[in-house]
Amino acid sequence: MDQETLPRTATEPMPAGDSDRFINRELSWLAFNSRVVAAAENPRYPLLERLRFISISGSNLDEFYSVRVAGLIGQARAGLALRSSDGLTPTQQLGEINRCARALMETQQRVLGTVLAELAGAGLTIIAPHELNEADRAFLDQHFMERVFPVLTPLAIDPAHPFPFVQNMGLVLALKLIRQEDSGVMRALIPLPAQIRRFIRLPDPSPETIRFVKLEDLVILFLDRLFHGFRLAGSGLFRVCRDTDVEFEEEAEDLVQSYETALKRRRRGAAIELTLAADLPDDLRTLVIDEVEAPEDQLFVEPGMLGLVDLKEMIVDDRPELLFPAYTPRFPERIRDFGGDCFAAIRNKDIIVHHPFESFDVVVQFLRQAASDPNVVAIKQTLYRTSRDSPIVGALIEAAESGKSVTAMVELRARFDEEANIRLARALEAAGVQVVYGFLGLKTHAKLSLVVRREGSAMRAYAHFGTGNYHPITARIYTDLSFFTCDQQLTRDAARLFNYMTGYARPEQMDQLVYSPITTRRVIAALIDAEIEAARAGRPSGIWLKLNSLVDERLIDHLYRASAAGVPVSCVVRGICCLRPGVPGLSENIRVKSIIGRFLEHARIAVFANGARMPDRENKVFISSADWMARNMDWRVETFVPIHNPTVHAQVLDQIMAVDLRDDVDSWTLGPDGVWTRVLPGDPPVSAHEYFMTNPSLSGRGSALRGPLTQQQRDQIRYRKTFLTND
């Protein structure tokens, strides 16, 4: 693929003012979504996967507007002059967002047009009503009357029928109708329910031909069933995005009831963005704009498709050649070596599981075994996000019903999962689980399980520390780490952290575990300072980071100081990055890359040289639930877990981090001007995701791997010298 970049490059030292030290957070997020859209242009990816990337980018942009843009609009309306890290006021940020978002939307539509054209060449099409044959119309007639007509609500708009409330992300068909008996004009709306599929698949004899009809076209096709005696004079879609940020009353006597009330308010949030189809007649456009009352600068006229998130409905299973090859995650051989006994495997040695390349089933099995094991006396579990029919929740309920002491720390404020978490909390309570909701003013984002088991005359604790949610569905596509241990110090620390979450009892000490909001920031600062001292003393130094977001100004400034001292810093940041790398006099020793590929990068890893070249057994390695953002350091409960076991240490350092740094197939690099440039594949090309799919992990190999790593084994997974931070 040709290199993608912008022509700007920084050749002179940049002044170290705030606006030059930091990249704007919101614009960095839009740049991330642009990389997602660029993935849809990647000819290496199968066509339906490219369509999926467009759908994901649409969903991302919807959430961005409903949360981030909504917050800035609220600040601007309130007259707040709060400035971003790069010195912009809310109004200035909204102007820049508007400019970048419009360009992004144009790119989305252009790429969508290309992908749909290529899909048509492969036999998968969206067809217009005039392309339907008699058999198609007969099928759609029945489909409409049985599945669509009963749930549609046509709404006339006149003094007796006021303009209705349009739900968040609601797609509405606006109509201009002519009454046939007197030529009178009527305007009407038909909200298209989200519960109905937007793309209706037509029956075809072979999957080699797949045809879809859009719901809005189906409604127009049978409009006479809804408005008999009228003819259509004009129509078009519009879509409303509403403010979904919600403030919870932390001091309420009944926290759950308070949250339910707040969630009802969210459904009627202020309109933040209004997108109108370009073919919407002028008089209907004026009506919609006047009634919806979205900000004037957040009105978008779209000549292409509205509601790109719905494109995911076109991703069918019966055209496997248009999808990524099916991949079955490996189950760790280490567990199999012990007959599926998770506790025996963990007692033998710590184990880390690399999702989705290794199955999330091992996490489920760990908790199911705990639930059914008569020697297990207690289970403690955090829950931030999980699936509707979660096997994790099922295991906790089974354990409680069998008489075990079960505690679940359920975070009610996981954005867009609040209602689901309220439901599961009630289900857990009904089964006898002790449910707690954590801290007022703090979100519990740590991913932690603790199982206490009677073994002989003693009690032994087993812990699971994760970087991702206990969600078996997202675990199929998110890259995350699950660390299992029965180390006495770590499990004791886990128990202390649970006591902190349930009883507000701040631990007097922690043996190994670092946690937010108390010690993470301080420990990270000390680790960076140690690298600065090593560099100044002429000893090996270096920092490797793998994060979703790098935003915190204080930590970024600390990395700048490390760079100035000569510490080489390499960062793999999937999403937002406010740090400017490669700026002479500020960050010339810092490199930042991003991997956007088949799987969503989600694990958080931090590595510090600790006086040794990298990678080396002496390097300090941590995995974490926390990104480097102020909220993760100061306003959330998070874990920052040291890795000591040699095999686990080698897997995280020599295998995962090394290969991520080496990837040149799905990678982008960030320049000092804030521009992301696609990395050109080498010869041979290196894909981190393909490597992890085809190479067993070191920790999970069990009997296939005995003893410490040999130098040859380390060399086999060594990254290319171009990414070596200690050259």
Curated annotation (Swiss-Prot):
ATP binds at N60, Y478, R574, H602. The keyword Transcription does not apply. Its EC number is 2.7.4.1. GO terms for biological process: polyphosphate biosynthetic process. Pfam families: PP_kinase, PP_kinase_C, PP_kinase_C_1, PP_kinase_N. GO terms for cellular component: polyphosphate kinase complex. The active site is at H445. Gene3D superfamilies: Endonuclease Chain A, Polyphosphate kinase middle domain, Polyphosphate kinase N-terminal domain. Mg(2+) binds at R385, R415. Belongs to the polyphosphate kinase 1 (PPK1) family. This is Polyphosphate kinase. It comes from Acidiphilium cryptum (strain JF-5). The gene is ppk.
